[in-house]
């Protein structure tokens, strides 16, 4: 007896189902799921895989997304504790790990998360040896280094979300002050994602008009308008949101989808992301810090050489020294 499906549909070919634009998100906490929904709403993948160790939560999140399939254009959403569900991914986004507690610095999380990465990274590499790795877990600069070391991948394929969000926060606050949309407010926050990030005041502009030229005291202590406060707010913003709602999720999710778009569509847009910076700005150790990078299908293909003041360069170097101090003690 022919089934209803057989009566309705005449099959023409047996297809082998290898996804062309598969994205995996490892970790289905608040950040992982914000990344997932942001990616789904930008139609970046033909298959989305979710991985976590908590199986009930994982299955629930997968089902909840699948139930929205009518409103999405990602035909396949899968999940599993076993990394075989991640096979053939173009991009693997790591959000798993211990989360920052209220008042805890990102650097404090480090050894807890290194131990988690020792399990995750080899499994990702086993099933998607040609993928790009996008690291989001904190402290992101150190964990991007850890992922690079464990994976054995070339440095262009290991990317930290880095200061992409810090710069977005900076541009939002700049826009609020000026009454201009953030996309027309240009400004870069570089270096460590977190407390020692470096705002590049000389590069701040709207429509190519340098703010520093109009207002030479910009970013200095003698600035009557206290623009330094804008960067201070960027640094404090995550702590404030964590204090208020317990974690951050939406902005980092959107920021990660922005990076994923540049990679999946080979856009070659410039983003402040964490990359191996050894040999630049007098840095001699294997550290990852955010500088403006060109992002495309091979990950980071090039970086932009930003002209920094001696003070900015010194701050970058100090970040590098701090990170290396922690990295050289790590056990993995």
UniProtKB/Swiss-Prot annotation:
Subcellular location: Cytoplasm
Residues holding substrate: 106, 138, 169, 248
Main location: cytoplasm
Annotated positions of the Phosphothreonine modification: 18, 309, 322
Positions carrying Phosphotyrosine: 239
A Pfam cross-reference name: Ldh_1_N
Residue list for modification N-acetylalanine: 2
Any one biological process term the GO annotation gives: lactate metabolic process
Active site: 193 (proton acceptor)
GO cellular component, one term: cytoplasm
Post-translational events: ISGylated.
Positions of modified residues (N6-succinyllysine): 5, 118, 318
Residues where Phosphoserine is found: 310
Residue sites binding NAD(+) per the record: 29-57, 99
Pathway assignment: Fermentation; pyruvate fermentation to lactate; (S)-lactate from pyruvate: step 1/1
Enzyme class: oxidoreductase
GO MF terms held by the record: L-lactate dehydrogenase activity
Binding partners and assembly: Homotetramer. Interacts with PTEN upstream reading frame protein MP31.
Job of this protein: Interconverts simultaneously and stereospecifically pyruvate and lactate with concomitant interconversion of NADH and NAD(+).
Family statement: Belongs to the LDH/MDH superfamily. LDH family.
Protein name per the record: L-lactate dehydrogenase A chain
């Amino acid at each position: 007896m022919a089934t209803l499906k057989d009566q309705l549909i005449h099959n023409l070919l047996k297809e082998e189902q290898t996804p062309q634009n598969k994205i995996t998100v490892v970790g289905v906490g608040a950040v992982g799921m914000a990344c997932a929904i942001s990616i789904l709403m930008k139609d970046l993948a033909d298959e989305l895989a979710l991985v976590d160790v908590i199986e009930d939560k994982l299955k629930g999140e997968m089902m909840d997304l699948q139930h929205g399939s009518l409103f999405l254009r990602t035909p396949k959403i899968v999940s599993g504790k076993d990394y075989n569900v991640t096979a053939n991914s173009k991009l693997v986004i790591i959000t798993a790990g211990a989360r920052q507690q209220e008042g805890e610095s990102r650097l404090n999380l480090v050894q807890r998360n290194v131990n988690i990465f020792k399990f995750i990274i080899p499994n990702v590499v086993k099933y998607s040896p040609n993928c790009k790795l996008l690291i989001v877990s904190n402290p992101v600069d150190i964990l991007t280094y850890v992922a690079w070391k464990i994976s054995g991948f070339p440095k262009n394929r290991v990317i930290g979300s880095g200061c992409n969000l810090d710069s977005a926060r900076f541009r939002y606050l700049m826009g609020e002050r000026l009454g201009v949309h953030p996309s027309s407010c240009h400004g870069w926050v570089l270096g460590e994602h977190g407390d020692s990030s470096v705002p590049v005041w000389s590069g701040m502009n709207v429509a190519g008009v340098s703010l520093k030229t109009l207002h030479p005291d910009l970013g200095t202590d003698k600035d009557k308008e206290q623009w330094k406060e804008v960067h201070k707010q960027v640094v404090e913003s995550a702590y404030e949101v964590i204090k208020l709602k317990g974690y951050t999720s939406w902005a980092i999710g959107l920021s990660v989808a922005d990076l994923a778009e540049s990679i999946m569509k080979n856009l070659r847009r410039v983003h402040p992301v964490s990359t191996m910076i050894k040999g630049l700005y007098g840095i001699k150790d294997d550290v990852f810090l955010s500088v403006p990078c060109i992002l495309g299908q091979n990950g980071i293909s090039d970086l932009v050489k930003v002209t920094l003041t001696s003070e900015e360069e010194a701050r970058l170097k100090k970040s590098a020294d701090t990170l290396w101090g922690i990295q050289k003690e790590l056990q993995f």
